[in-house]
Amino acid sequence: MFSKILTKVIGSRNDRTLRKLRKIVDQINKLEPQFESLQDEELKAKTIEFRSRLEQGESLDDLLPEAFATVREASKRLYGMRHFDVQMIGGMVLNDSQIAEMRTGEGKTLTATLPCYLNALTGKGVHVVTVNDYLAKRDAETNRELFEFLGMTVGINVPNMPPQEKKLAYQSDILYGTNNEFGFDYLRDNMAFRAEDRVQRERYFAVIDEVDSILIDEARTPLIISGPADDSSELYTRINILIPQLVKQDEEDSEDYRGEGHYTLDEKGKQTHLTENGQEFVEQLLKDEGLMEEEDTLYSPANISLLHHINAALRAHVLFEKDVDYIVKDDEVIIVDEHTGRTMPGRRWSEGLHQAVEAKEGVKIQNENQTLASITFQNFFRLYDKLSGMTGTADTEAFEFQSIYGLDTVVIPTNRPMTRNDMGDLVYMTEAEKFAAIIEDIKACSERGQPVLVGTVSIEKSELLSNALKTAKIKHNVLNAKFHEQEADIVANAGTSSAVTIATNMAGRGTDIVLGGNWQAEVAKLDNPSAEQVQTIKAAWKEAHDTVLTAGGLHIIGTERHESRRIDNQLRGRAGRQGDAGSSRFYLSMEDALMRIFASDRVSNMMKKLGMEEGEAIEHPWVTKAIENAQRKVEGRNFDIRKQLLEYDDVANDQRKVVYELRDELMNVDDISEMINHNRQDVLEGLFGQYIPPQSLEEMWDVEGLTTRLRTDFDLDLPIQEWLDSDNKLHEDNLREKIIESAFQVYKEKEESVGESVLRNFEKAVMLQTLDGLWKEHLAAMDHLRQGIHLRGYAQKNPKQEYKRESFELFEGLLDTLKLDVVSILSKVRVQQQEDVERMEEQRRKNAEEVARLQKLQHQNAENQLDDGHSSDQNHSPMVRDERKVGRNEVCPCGSGKKYKQCHGKI
């Protein structure tokens, strides 16, 4: 109560921020006459002046008013477009590393030019991040003339660019690209073998367009670069045949309950598991197929791979639906992005799921993949010194932006008041009744000349509605993942009189729907249009625009509520741009996924008690509130999942930083001999301690074991026993020093025989190759660890703490093994000449090229992350080892009670 009164008196945080920024806008506006009087050359020269002032110690904040005034004036001269005051505020919010919530049609693309120009003055480069290639190219081409007029270079970063082109693009002052491509470039750079093969430079300032889509919706989908693993396509096919024989278990309190089924299905959590009955049934099927021994069970260690295949196949059949989660095109399964409705060619689900779906659909099964590198968007974008974003809908997720990314959200006022009429939801009993009502609404709008945009949640629903419209003989366009090649054209005409457009989810987002059609798109179709032709097109558009306004503007129909209120708001936001008339309404049914899974039974019971007849709808604020409460629950659950994913990934991220920093260091220096010498000292001291324990009696010394180990692992044939026999004063410390000195001496002789530069190159090559191999295995071990860590909860242990502890032990083991392997290889190898190094370098490059050719860029399935005490599906990533590698300081698994390094670790 008190906080509400205080807010009324002093204003909200948002109000206070806007008041402060309006004062700076006033300063910029006062500069306008001065900048209008400048000649073009004088305006262009401002960039050189600003850069010079930065070098002399002025800050970007000092330059901001003049820099923004420069961009506004250039835009007026080139495009005839003057930045509104609210766009100036938006630009300042972005420059302050905050999120600007700007409604659809308020000119986010033009707003971004302001902070991009200002921050590009530093020479460090600015990245403008978009959700797809089309928007990256469009925005780059739209703003290229403006930036180049002011002396800035503009680049585009899209998939499949040659490395040299990509490297050149990263040198641009302002670079437009997709979130995926920036992330994958980072991973690829950290797999490069030479410094000159890397394309990125420092990550200074990023402006993310549709920031909610990238930092919220896609936060659960890690970017993964993977290479091919072993071929097991036949096994997927054989197991796929078994799955349709399984029966789902009904809820015990449901009318259909027929006893224990073979698997459970949790639609809310998007999980499925075999029941005990199902496990026994599957085991019998596998035995009948000859895939399992008679006395075996699914959970015996030898059958872990079979269990992995069964779980993947079960998920493919039960959780993943054709034309909703994926489409089949050209004998390939192509993922459909659940957030945008777009297809993602080249992307593959990990952990065998994609192969299981391919087997289900009867298309060619491609090889499984093994993770070579991965990172989440959360951790990638936190690498930037400055991060900001724009979207039409961020306020509902403001808490998440602040808690995970440290980004405040500022709601920017519209340039003109919003006049859209958002009508209440209509709820029907069945989907058929709902679709009938939607058809009637579309008919009525079409007859009065009002354009309609219908939002659906899946390709399947969009095609169902399209067929119903065809039956009703209503002309319409479909905008979904199957037809996004014509996307821009369909969106350009979606605002024309009586146009009916069906859009899957938010396909077409990023392109404004202009009432009366897009006259600029019409002009673009002409070759060298004359001023008269342009004028004629504009006049025709003005007439069409006024006709549509009279009919009520764009009408939005939502066919289902989404899990997130934000996505519903995005759909509504397509209407009412820049103060235009518009309206929106959602049509729901009790058969919709959200209503069925999350909305309480009260709504359904209320409708039944009212004795509603077929075709009748209920419209009441209580119903709308119940639905919004259901959405809040889902949003809260999804936030918890994303937060948890980040907590687990932060552990891997700390390790990733260490490994990538080590790689950087290796690639940036020519001589790593000091590092090698330090490692040799550590390794030999550790080895010595295993066989001759500190401060121990000579009777406890294993001289023979030490001699053998030095000979086999380090090619050192030392007469240690003879030394001891001939010198009674050769104690433990002296003996250790003598062995280490001998090792250094042998290596020095090797250096003299092959040449210093040859050996330096060879050391670097061996270190890089060994590090990459161990890191790949470590990622597989971490995946394996994370998938079973939730079981620690049953032992009254905190899974997160256990994960941190064990992953740290794994990482310590990696660093120890790296030292040991590198020193061992360098000690044993015989480098004859420079050609040996070059041959190794060439082989390594060929291997890298082969991996690059075959590697898949994946989005790991979002739903198979873990929470603390609840199992996700038992999906086992392709493993390098069958078991977790035993750490050198752990107890030996043989049962001796000794440390592994002092027992079987010696072997």
UniProtKB/Swiss-Prot annotation:
Gene Ontology CC annotation, any one: cytosol
Q: What's the catalysed reaction?
A: ATP + H2O + cellular proteinSide 1 = ADP + phosphate + cellular proteinSide 2
Q: How does it sit in the membrane?
A: Peripheral membrane protein
Q: What GO molecular-function term can you cite, just one?
A: protein-exporting ATPase activity
Query: Can you quote the record's cofactor note?
Result: May bind 1 zinc ion per subunit.
Pfam (any one): SecA_PP_bind
Q: Where along the chain is ATP bound?
A: 87, 105-109, 512
Task: State where composition is biased (Basic and acidic residues).
Answer: 867-885
UniProt-annotated binding residues for Zn(2+): 892, 894, 903-904
Q: Does the keyword Nucleotide-binding apply?
A: yes
Role of this protein: Part of the Sec protein translocase complex. Interacts with the SecYEG preprotein conducting channel. Has a central role in coupling the hydrolysis of ATP to the transfer of proteins into and across the cell membrane, serving both as a receptor for the preprotein-SecB complex and as an ATP-driven molecular motor driving the stepwise translocation of polypeptide chains across the membrane.
Q: What is the name of this protein? A: Protein translocase subunit SecA
Native source organism of the sequence? Aliivibrio salmonicida (strain LFI1238)
